[in-house]
Amino acid sequence: MLEVRSMDMTPKSPEPESETPTRIQPAKPISFSNGIIKRHHHHHHNNNKVTYKECLKNHAAAIGGHALDGCGEFMPSPSSTPSDPTSLKCAACGCHRNFHRRETDDSSAVPPPSLLPSSTTTAAIEYQPHHRHHPPPPLAPPLPRSPNSSSPPPISSSYMLLALSGNNKTAPFSDLNFAAAANHLSATPGSRKRFRTKFSSNQKEKMHEFADRIGWKIQKRDEDEVRDFCREIGVDKGVLKVWMHNNKNSFKFSGGGATTVQRNDNGIGGENSNDDGVRGLANDGDGGGGRFESDSGGADGGGNVNASSSSS
């Protein structure tokens, strides 16, 4: 006997497919700094290699010059420790590491903003603060100074040492000239103050004696003697010539005797200079019309000093 099973012919509604709902990603937060829109960037810490090049310390700053020690690269001394910044000194020049020019090898630099893909969210002006952690740009080497520059030119080490050594009276004549040249270089070119030479008391005495000996004038025949004398006392020939010109009137006529006047013995009154430098009047009394030291006048009845007259 066959069983007839009733089949449910009712149309069934299709079961909804289980679909994963699409999640909307939230937009990246936009923060404002100083009123300017900025994006959040993922900071990639680049391991940049930092090297320290030539030393830029000015060893002549105290005298207004510019002198470098010539050290080409920083070499850490064996006693330097990274934990103690004060111990980071160069083994070659002895200067601290901060005096050396810092150079960064930035091989993985960020491309410029113009090469980045454009986005609708980057339409606003972008402020990138991640450049703050980068080291400052390296210092440029000192530029050559123009001739019209107001700052003094660099002074070489030999000139600088001679200028700082003081007034050495026993130094040779050539060294004294170098020291004088260094003093001229250390002065400001724009200043109008004239360089004046200062003499010691010993130099003044020797120059006075030498000027008396040659007659306070440098002659052609005295060239060798003047040159030897200048080398002995350490004074230039032109300086000695100017000193003799300025002091000949004050030293030449400040001696013991006054001006010598020839004595007049013919009866005419005249001036005479005695031994102690006091001017006096002298006459032998045999002439007339002159001034006499005695109370009586001459044969012609001339007046006398005491205002009394007599006739012979």
UniProtKB/Swiss-Prot annotation:
DNA-binding region ranges: 192-255
Role played: Putative transcription factor.
Keywords for the protein's UniProt record, in alphabetical order: DNA-binding, Homeobox, Metal-binding, Nucleus, Phosphoprotein, Transcription, Transcription regulation, Zinc, Zinc-finger
Subcellular location(s) per record: Nucleus
Xref: PANTHER family: ZINC-FINGER HOMEODOMAIN PROTEIN 2, ZINC-FINGER HOMEODOMAIN PROTEIN 9
Tissue: Mostly expressed in flowers, stems and inflorescence and, to a lower extent, in leaves and stems.
Main location: nucleus
Site (Required for DNA-binding): 244
Region (Disordered): 1-27, 128-155, 253-312
The keyword Repeat is annotated on this UniProt entry: no
Domain-level remarks: The homeodomain differs form the typical one by having namely 4 instead of 3 extra amino acids inserted in the loop between helix 1 and helix 2.
GO biological process, one term: glucosinolate metabolic process
A Pfam family that the UniProt record links to this protein: ZF-HD_dimer
UniProt biased composition (Pro residues): 136-155
GO molecular function: DNA binding; protein homodimerization activity; transcription cis-regulatory region binding; zinc ion binding
Residue numbers of Phosphoserine PTMs: 13, 273
Protein's name in the database: Zinc-finger homeodomain protein 9
UniProt source species: Arabidopsis thaliana
Taxonomic superkingdom: Eukaryota
SUPFAM superfamilies assigned to the protein according to its UniProt record, in alphabetical order: Homeodomain-like
